[in-house]
Amino acid sequence: MFRGANAISLDAKGRLAMPSRYRDELVARCNGQLIVTIDAVDPCLCVYPLAEWELIENKLRELASFREENRRLQRLLIGNAVDLELDASGRFLVPPRLREYAKLDKRAMLVGQLNKFQLWDEDAWNAVAEADLAAIKQPGALSDDLRDLIL
């Protein structure tokens, strides 16, 4: 399970180092094999261990292909998916096209989302986190299920 928000840096080639606290789990779960693709809702990237991504591919494969919204989602997620592997130093290279989509430069945030990570530009992450916090404080902003979840 991946949790927490980690400030990380991209080097001039677009490589970033996976925080050490996740490396052993990623090597154990998927031999360091990752899939990175765009997030279809937020201006960030999603980084999946290979096995988690394969579950998503199976779900996408089962969608009715005659529905335009299904094809659209398949094109976005699968069409932008790139296979990556952690190198011996625990780094991986984010392709230029995906860096451009998420507006990644030097400072980024790797945010654990249980079964995957989101990779954000640091300024964009800070703005979204602040807006999310303000939104959930609004009266009626949370469903009963979410209110019961908050400790």
Curated annotation (Swiss-Prot):
| Domain named SpoVT-AbrB: residues | 5-52, 81-124
Q: Does the entry feature the keyword Nucleus, yes or no?
A: no
Q: Would the keyword Coiled coil turn up in this protein's UniProt record?
A: no
Localization recorded for this chain is: Cytoplasm, Nucleoid
Under SUPFAM superfamilies, the record lists: AbrB/MazE/MraZ-like
Keywords recorded for this protein, A-Z: Cytoplasm, DNA-binding, Repeat, Transcription, Transcription regulation
Q: What is its main location?
A: cytoplasm
Sorted alphabetically, the Gene Ontology cellular component annotations on this record are: cytoplasm; nucleoid
GO terms in the biological process aspect are: negative regulation of DNA-templated transcription initiation
Superkingdom is Bacteria
Which residues are connected by disulfide bridges in this protein? none
Q: Name one GO molecular function term.
A: transcription cis-regulatory region binding
Family of this protein: Belongs to the MraZ family.
Q: Which NCBIfam families match?
A: division/cell wall cluster transcriptional repressor MraZ
Quaternary structure and partners: Forms oligomers.
**What is the protein name given in its UniProt record?**
Transcriptional regulator MraZ
Which organism is this protein's natural source?
Ectopseudomonas mendocina (strain ymp)
